[in-house]
Amino acid sequence: MNGVVIPQTPIAVDFWSLRRAGTARLFFLSHMHCDHTVGLSSTWARPLYCSPITAHLLHRRLQVSKQWIRALEIGESHVLLLDEIGQETMTVTLIDANHCPGSVMFLFEGYFGTILYTGDFRYTPSMLKEPALTLGKQIHTLYLDNTNCNPALVLPSRQEATQQIIQLIRQFPQHNIKIGLYSLGKESLLEQLALEFQTWVVLSPQRLELVQLLGLADVFTVEEEAGRIHAVDHMEICHSAMLQWNQTHPTIAIFPTSRKIRSPHPSIYSIPYSDHSSYSELRAFVAALRPCQVVPIVREQPCGEFFQDSLSPRLSMPLIPHSVQQYMSSSSRKTNVFWQLERRLKRPRTQGVVFESPEEKADQVKVDRDSKKHKKESLSPWAGCLSRLCPHPLQARKQLFPDFCRKEGDEPVLFCDSNKMATVLTAPLELSVQLQPVDEFPFPETREEIGLGSPLWSGGGSGSPTRGKQSNGMGCGSPPTHISRTTHLTPESGGLALKYLLTPVDFLQAGFSSRNFDQQVEKHQRVQCNNPAVMNTVDDV
């Protein structure tokens, strides 16, 4: 990006990154080439100053809103405010840069002294006759286009390069001519070629609109077969395109540029026609202005050493007025706010099709398989029934049923010492299990302490339910029989795990939570204490 924020000022030229602009408040565009509009788009929402032609192209090509574009006439001086109270002002004058349609140089004058920003320009002696430069003004800082600032690079003038192109075309009187161009620039060259060879120049509709805006001669058309000279995008000229063109009609291609180009086809020619100043022209320009310092616009190519003998004594840095400092600081804060707002409002980008990696998918399948296997081994054979009937936490079920296994007939058995086991039945009353002795639980609690009127039934010798008594001889294979209420538990049947196991059916609801379990138990206890008859009754089956 060829742009700059001028230090100690609120001025930015060809610089469109608000996050990096810092204290910049006034933004200027020298011309519409893409390397000077990086970051500039239709979302731009700040005043922007440029020439009238650039203003038209800016709106047409980048869709920048007209409400932010400030077109300034070339050759006139314009006064702009540098603060919010109108105390400090500066004068900016636009000078034709002789580079492409709408390109200008900016001459800034204010508390910071006099600054000339050339942008991309092709020097001609007539520039020194501009009124803004003939008043004996001292240029304190010169921002110079140093694209061709190389003593080893010798370039002809535009007029000389144009004659070279004309001589080349005359060598191929029966050929079509393809001129490789960028989207903007060298329109005057096309006009000269059309007048020289008395032929139409075929353009794209977009470039035709531009030449009509510039008021050039009526020698341009969009009809492919109307003329032998065709202006095409420079990217279209390649080996395959040359083969295709020559199959229909003999064709040569010309690149009017000072850049070194490796020709991929023998019919492609390069002519050093440049829109940038040559080294000798830069030397003449700097020697005539005698600025205090030269700052290269193309930062990758330092050129200060070439102009040391043409500089005036450097002046001290100017002081920034207090009102301008406030103006610049407020601009910085607003810039950050605008950027944060834009970042929040920006919609997320739509993701494309994302394919899963086969390796990652295989690893995930293996992990899922191992997880299911571990879960199957960890749960008892009755885990499926318990998960459906008893909404107890998985950890509690693991603690309550640690030793279950299956026989060949899939009947549940428990390998244990029958002398140390208590036989109880849980609610819902569909399963018969054996628990460890209550004295082995870490926090023993009696029935009276927890207030459980838990349903309990025991099977007699015949397997039929018995009311009000607990069976002492019930085996593991006794079938469970469902009843709604049972007699009281003995005090020895308490225990921390029984809180979750020996629970009335009406407590086992969808909204059950272990967090409020104790509160529900206390409430149930108070109800039963107030109505003791309920605790001693059993509904008929």
Curated annotation (Swiss-Prot):
Residues 358-371 have a biased composition (Basic and acidic residues). One of its GO terms (cellular component) is cytoplasm. A motif (TBM) lies at residues 492-507. Residues 350-375, 450-489 are annotated as: Disordered. Interacts with TERF2; the interaction is direct. Interacts with MUS81, MRE11 and FANCD2. Interacts with HSPA2, HSPA8 and HSPA14. Interacts with SPAG5. Its EC number is 3.1.-.-, 3.5.2.6. The keyword Ubl conjugation applies. Pfam families: DRMBL (PF07522). Ubiquitinated, leading to its degradation. Interaction with TERF2 protects it from ubiquitination. It is an enzyme of class 3 (hydrolase). Keywords: Chromosome, Cytoplasm, Cytoskeleton, DNA damage, DNA repair, Exonuclease, Hydrolase, Isopeptide bond, Nuclease, Nucleus, Telomere, Ubl conjugation. It catalyses: a beta-lactam + H2O = a substituted beta-amino acid. The TBM domain mediates interaction with TERF2. GO terms for molecular function: 5'-3' DNA exonuclease activity; 5'-3' exonuclease activity; beta-lactamase activity; damaged DNA binding; protein homodimerization activity; protein-containing complex binding. GO terms for biological process: double-strand break repair via nonhomologous end joining; interstrand cross-link repair; protection from non-homologous end joining at telomere; telomere capping; telomere maintenance; telomere maintenance via telomere lengthening; telomeric 3' overhang formation; telomeric loop formation. It is found in: Chromosome, Telomere; Nucleus; Cytoplasm, Cytoskeleton, Microtubule organizing center, Centrosome. It comes from Rattus norvegicus. 5'-3' exonuclease that plays a central role in telomere maintenance and protection during S-phase. Participates in the protection of telomeres against non-homologous end-joining (NHEJ)-mediated repair, thereby ensuring that telomeres do not fuse. Belongs to the DNA repair metallo-beta-lactamase (DRMBL) family. This is 5' exonuclease Apollo. InterPro entries: DRMBL (IPR011084), RibonucZ/Hydroxyglut_hydro (IPR036866).
